Amino acid sequence: MGESIKVGLTYATPFWREKSSGTIFSNVGPIPEMYDHSNAEETYFGLMGFLNGAYHSVSKEKRLEMILKQLTKYYGKQATDYLSYEETVWHHEELTSTPYASHVLPHQNNGNLVFQKTYANGRFILAGTETSPVYSGYMEGAIRSARSTADKLKELFKQ
């Protein structure tokens, strides 16, 4: 986590849904991934995502400018009409950032079979995006892991 920056923008409406999705996966621009982060009651609308940690040395204002430029490419001018912008630069947080001796590969151990097994006669189950063999490290991986874990629990409680 220490190598990323978490960002969030709030809006008056979920205009991105008109363009099909609030989900972004990109290899171009500062935002590699972003999600619709609106509440279930549909009273709060936001986009939440991550920036590459290399942007930690760029000013908050410049990061926001780059984010809005990328969002405008996806969603149009409405992306610049945000209500609030928040960010956490994990690199600056003492308890979540550790200097690395070398380049950190993304999601290097995620999806390993050891994370998909149950332990203690099926009573100890690991769950989370890191355990998913598909899309591990991403929201889709978390959803798949949750479904897999639910299936394991159903099977466990049948007995």
Where are the regions a protein language model picked out?
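Central helical "cap/lid" subdomain
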Residues: M1-K19
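Conserved flavin/dinucleotide-binding core of flavoenzymes
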Residues: K19-Q159
